[in-house]
Every structure is written in C-alpha cells, then in structure tokens.
Amino acid sequence: MRYNQYSYTKASEEVMLDELARLGFTIQTTNSPKENLHHFLQKILFRYQDVNYVLSSWVADQKTDLLTFFQSDKQLTEEVFYTVALQVLGFAPFVDFDDVTAFCKEIHFPITYGNILENLYQLLNTRTKLGNTLIDQLVSEGFIPESNDYHFFNGKSLATFSSHEAIREVVYVESRVDTDGDGKPDLVKVSIIRPSYEGQVPAVMTASPYHQGTNDKASDKALHNMNVDLSCKNPRTITVQESSIQTIEPQGQASLVEKAEEKLGHIGSYTLNDYLLPRGFANLYVSGVGTKDSEGMMTSGDYQQIEAYKNVIDWLNGRCRAFTDHTRQREIKATWSNGKVATTGISYLGTMSNGLATTGVDGLEVIIAEAGISSWYNYYRENGLVTSPGGYPGEDFESLTELTYSRNLLAGEYLRHNQAYQAYLDQQRKDLERETGDYNQFWHDRNYLIHADKVKAEVVFTHGSQDWNVKPLHVYNMFHALPAHIKKHLFFHNGAHVYINNWQSIDFRESMNALLSKKLLGHSSDFDLPPVIWQDNSQAQNWMSLDDFGNQEDYSHFHLGKGSQEIRNRYSDEDYNRFAKSYQVFKNELFEGKTQQITLDWTLEQDLFINGPAKLKLRLKSSTNKGLISAQLLDYWPAKRLTPIPSLLEPRVMDNGRYYMLDNLMELPFADTPHRVITKGFLNLQNRTDLLTVEEVVPNQWMELSFELQPTIYKLKKGDQLRLVLYTTDFEHTVRDKTDYHLSVDMEHSSLSLPHKKS
C-alpha cells in the first residue's frame, strides 16, 4: 500500500478543535501529546467495554505494549506515534513492518509527527489498510448517531443518514422531445433513492441506457462481419452544419399530488452513488428515451437523448413536470430537491455526463465523467476508417442501439412499436455510412466537442491510458475543448475501461465527497484538486499532480532509418483465418515482429516523460488506389509494470455507509510483463489531410502525411527500449482487408515525435 492523499484539507487550530469536539473528542492543548493520544484512543475504541485489553494487544515499540506505555512515564516519541497510528489504521507490527520509520517512508505515510492536534485530526482523515478513512470506518460502526442530518468533517459529509430509512420511489418525467412521433412528449422513468430528511437535498444522477436491461440477442445479431475489404472512396469534400433538435411543449393538465405512487424495488447501483447516499445525496438512475418503462426511440447519443436526461435536471429545479405513472393524470414535484445536481458513471454513462454538460443546464454543478465519449465518430471510426472499440470487433452504432432499446423487452411494447423501431433502425444503418467510414451529419450531431463552449459545471474526468474501448483521445479532446474559466480535473490512471472509486491507492471517492459537499451542499471549504492527477506507470500505487495533459513544447524526434521498407497487406489463407479467429493471436505475433510489418527499436539515451499525443510523419506510397496505415508504440522489454485490470485485494471490506453496500478493495497489480502498449493509431490514406477531405490515392505515387496517435502520459527511463510497429490491417480494430497490395515507406523522410515534459 502507498498513500496518495488528495481529499485532505489543512485546517486552522480553531476549526480542528471545533470539529473534533463535535465528534466528542476533548483534545486539550494544555495536555501533553501522550495524554491527548490516550484520550483519542479511548474514544475511538468505543465498541469495547475493556479498552485496556485492546491497548495491551497493541504495542508502543518493539519491546513495550501500549497499555504498559501509557502506565509508564515514557514520553511520546515520533516512533511511538507512528507505531500506534499504523495499528489504528489496521497495520500489524512484526507482520506488515518491523522498522516503523522505513515503513512510513515506503508507504508515503501522509502524517508528519509534530503537532499532536493536527496529527490526530489528519489521522481521522487517513485511509485504513482496508480502504475507508478512519472517520468513515468509525461512523460506519456507530461512532455518532444516525441522525438523518448533515455532519461534516474536514469538508466532507459523514454517513449520518440512514440508508435503511431512505425513500425509494419512481416518477416519470415529461421530456421536451417526441422521438417516437406519437405527438406526445416522451415520458422518462426516474428511479429515486433519497435520504429521509425534512429539508432539501442535492442529487447525483446516473444517466444509463443500460439501467433497465439490455437486449443482448438483438445486439449480437446486428454485429458486422469484419472480414471485408477496405473500400475505395470517391474523392470529395464533406460538409456538415450545426443542427438543432425539435422540442415539444407540455401537454394536458394533471392534478398535483404530494407523494409518488410507485415504489422502487431492488436495482443495480453504482458504488460511488451508494457511498454518497448515506452522506445526504439523493441517487437518481435514469435510463432515458427508448428504454424499458420509458417512451420514445433510442436515438443513441444525439441531443434528443440528452435533452430527455436534461429534463430530469429541469424537473429537479421546477422547470419540467413529472407524473406518478404513465396515465399523466397526477403530477408530482421534486419538493425535496435543492436543485443542485452532479452526474456519475462510466462509459455510456460518462458520455451522457459530457453531453449534459454541453447543454449548460442550470442546476448541473459537477459532472464526474468516467471514460466518457466526447465524439461518437471517434468511438466507432478513426481518421476515415471503420474501427471497432477494443475488444468488440464488428460492433457499430446500430448494434449498440439494439442493445439499449430495451422497450422491446416488454412484449406489449414490442407489438405496438417494433415496426416503427425497425424502420428507424434501417435509417440509422444508412446514416452510419459504414461503407466509407467517413464523418457526416449523423456523426456531427453526436459530437459534443463543438458545444463545449456552453459548459458551466465543474468537470471531473477519469480515464485509463490502457482504455482501448473509449480511447484516451475522448478525454484529451474534451479536456482541451472546455472554456478556459471552467475548473477541470482529470484522474488519468493506467487501467483499462474501469472504475477507480474502490482502489486502495487513491482517495477518489473521498475527493468526490469533498467536492460535492462544497458544490452541492454549499459547505465552506478550501478543497481543490489539481488539473491532472496521474498514476505513475513506473511504480506501484504512486500518483502525481501535473499541470496539464499535453500542451508540451518539447519533442523528442526519432527518425525511422534509411532507404525504403515495404508492408504487405495480404496474408496467406491460413494466417488470415488464424488472426480472424483470434485477434489476440494477431496482437501477440505483431508485438513479437512476426506479422507483415515494419518493426523499429530504439534504446533511450535519457529519461523520457511523454505527455500528449505522439505524432507520426510518413512518406509512403501504395501499390493500389487505397490503403490504411496502422501504428503501435510499445515499451518493449521485460519489466514490472502496472497491468490494466484491477485485482481484488480484499472482498467486501469498504462500508459505503453504516452496515450498507460493502464494496471490494481493488488495485492495479504491478507485475512482470514482456511489454506495454504506450499508444496506437489508424489512418485511411484517403483521409490523410483531414476528416472532411477524401482524396484519391494514386497507385505508386509518394504521399506525405502526418497523424497523431492516441494521447497518453507515460514515463520511460534511460536504457528502456521503444518499439514502433507499422502495418496495415489490424484484426482487432479495422476491417480485415484481403486485398493484395503493399505500402512502401520512405524511412529517411519519416519520423516519430514524442511530446515530453522538460527533465
């Protein structure tokens, strides 16, 4: 374990004494540090009748148990304090450590012994070995009453709301869109879990088209065959325009009622939301248009879908109506809401956070967009190519639409609406232009970057450098598209497409508590986060604050060599079938230099801290009238590295409230690996200038082009080896072209440029 503490805010002596007193601690500045520590321990051991037994079970040093120490005239020293503090946090002397000073240095222990008041205050804010902060662990065990009222400590709301007394209800928000064309505003189901509280509370909203269930069978049937050739496109200039959606006004009258009539049963939830509920934040789960128990079509990422989610925020602020059921006869207002909202969730859920932020809707104070898409084109396409998300060959937009159109899971809805839905889906297939892979109006209408100037909320991103599903380009582009005055924070980790709120190494959920307590509850606090919090790839459990993602002025340039080298596209039938059957086999052989490729290796002569997108400048020609170029850059030598999928450290040990929704403690393993993909990228040679320009590829005519690979942050050391592989067809991401052509690369006039921080 290594501490990386971002949620803690230094406080004045007056504030510390006051907050400690509110918790029942009577720390006296006139007492000795030893006396104050003794009182502190007696207080936190409230579950025990015989506190002396516990003290006798702990040690003060390698020769003295803690009870004996307090009964002696020995002074409290730095070594004794650290030994006791570590035991309070769940570490075991003689098991986890022998040398306490060395161990504190090893785990980057955040407390510096000196001021016992500040030390004990910070100790309560420090994470235990099992993930909860000490104060959260104590509260979960009943340290203070479950009062259904707010109680703050170090700027964070404590779990003083009963999750068992929470109000669970369902309402149906009247949206301002009519996506199924029936002349009525689409109703959207909202599942609510909110604290039992006499006043008003804020909400964390998760906009998830998956929440009401998914139609996996229909989605699987809609997958595309990737074993097709790359198309030769007609040269043209693509034009797009900014469009707006049609909205519909509220219809009819309804009587006003005070209580919802539909009770919410068990639902799947997000553990960050679970953590926030007993701290006084209502949880809202919204599936949106086209989903089970809601109305409308699944418009998949456009601003009609986003408008319906936005209308839920409007309802929380009194600007839209909600009904108790589909009859629309009884209206219910969100009188419990203080109007302030944060959004949460990963992938499609984080995508909707991005989209919602670009509406500038009043009441949306914070988005927590985890691995969210910023432009749908960049999810299913790349530089004029059809590209499948990592791990999902053959998926395209209509298979996602089929997956999330869960209205068809209700047989009656299927009978009434499936014919119209199939016609809608047929039109979507045409609009995708899968044959060309080109950008067009369909994709432009699902590009949130062009509306980023409207963002008013504070923005938190999380994203993984090894996320080849929603690639790092999405967060990089959104991060830089935001207006300069918007506060933004990026947690850039080394995982894949994963959550980070239950990781041992980073106090992410506590940081979100501090931010939302400040922004949604109005609690006065000096809490702030740096622009970028980056997980250091060179060692286990180490995070660093950075000023920016990209925007580096310095580049390291690597020339590709001399002469010309050739990349053949067509494989033997045997190899083609092997690779098409398992893209992982292809990847393994690609990295080992065994496929049809150009392989270049460099040994670094100095440390290199990459920050931003790598740039490839190539001079090449194709033997035919089309072609694609693929590139991957690897950290290529056997070493210990962070692996991309979190592993389980301890099951169900993090209490999100008070005996409520236990979460697993997870972390990225630091393990021996043969190599690591740093970045990758793909380009259709007919789109070598830009997305809106489709050009002719003249056979055997040299072309000069440059394109950026996926942005990343990655630390390399002197002596490390870089491997660049250039090839054509990628059996995981691109169409699997069988055309018998080759690319010739002019090595002398081609180069790789890596942006880096100054050393």
Curated annotation (Swiss-Prot):
The gene is pepX. Removes N-terminal dipeptides sequentially from polypeptides having unsubstituted N-termini provided that the penultimate residue is proline. Belongs to the peptidase S15 family. GO terms for biological process: proteolysis. The keyword Cytoplasm applies. The keyword Iron does not apply. InterPro entries: AB_hydrolase_fold, Galactose-bd-like_sf, Pept_S15_Xpro, PepX_N_dom, PepX_N_dom_sf, Xaa-Pro-like_dom, Xaa-Pro_dipept_C, Xaa-Pro_dipeptidyl-ppase/CocE. Homodimer. It is found in: Cytoplasm. It comes from Streptococcus gordonii (strain Challis / ATCC 35105 / BCRC 15272 / CH1 / DL1 / V288). GO terms for molecular function: aminopeptidase activity; dipeptidyl-peptidase activity; serine-type peptidase activity. Keywords: Aminopeptidase, Cytoplasm, Hydrolase, Protease, Serine protease. It catalyses: Hydrolyzes Xaa-Pro-|- bonds to release unblocked, N-terminal dipeptides from substrates including Ala-Pro-|-p-nitroanilide and (sequentially) Tyr-Pro-|-Phe-Pro-|-Gly-Pro-|-Ile. This is Xaa-Pro dipeptidyl-peptidase. SUPFAM superfamilies: alpha/beta-Hydrolases (SSF53474), Galactose-binding domain-like (SSF49785), X-Prolyl dipeptidyl aminopeptidase PepX, N-terminal domain (SSF81761). Its main location: cytoplasm. Its EC number is 3.4.14.11. The active site is at residues 347, 467, 497. One of its GO terms (cellular component) is cytoplasm.
